[in-house]
């Protein structure tokens, strides 16, 4: 019974913080006088590292690029990070925690930071929809399974 208690899954948020923020409006004020119908591109990436036994940093990088025609109106990148205590899981469950569960926690903070930066750049309000990191993680696993025997690993 005591072995079972030692192997129970534990998850705790230690800290959530903004690691890096960048906002660029390379063609301002050109776009302030045009009709605002940009193409918005959203890029997401995650990284994790072990800080101590059962303590991990997970970083969610969110990049939003708004373009009108060929020109970039703005580019905003936020690295939202968290320090988490995670124990009692491994393998695919740990990968899911790093690739989906923690990013689901971090994304609302990153979204708020991006919205604030875009507003400070005096661009119209940007509302980013929630992201289903669980579905993205499942797609990633499926791609890994599909390509495991037929292709060498590719850099993202």
UniProtKB/Swiss-Prot annotation:
Indicate whether Transport appears among the record's keywords: yes
Record keywords, A-Z = Chaperone, Cytoplasm, Protein transport, Translocation, Transport
For this UniProt entry, what is the primary localization, expressed as one broad class? cytoplasm
Please provide the Gene Ontology terms (biological process) for this protein. Answer: protein folding; protein tetramerization; protein transport
GO MF, any single term:
unfolded protein binding
Transport among keywords: yes
**Which SUPFAM superfamilies does this entry report, sorted A to Z?**
SecB-like (SSF54611)
The lineage's top-level taxon is Bacteria
Report the GO terms under cellular component: cytoplasm
Annotated compartments: Cytoplasm
Entry-linked InterPro entries: SecB, SecB-like_sf
Q: How does it assemble?
A: Homotetramer, a dimer of dimers. One homotetramer interacts with 1 SecA dimer.
User: Record's family?
Assistant: Belongs to the SecB family.
PANTHER family recorded: PROTEIN-EXPORT PROTEIN SECB (PTHR36918:SF1), PTHR36918
What does the protein in this record do?
Answer: One of the proteins required for the normal export of preproteins out of the cell cytoplasm. It is a molecular chaperone that binds to a subset of precursor proteins, maintaining them in a translocation-competent state. It also specifically binds to its receptor SecA.
Q: What is this protein called?
A: Protein-export protein SecB
Q: Which organism is it from?
A: Sodalis glossinidius (strain morsitans)
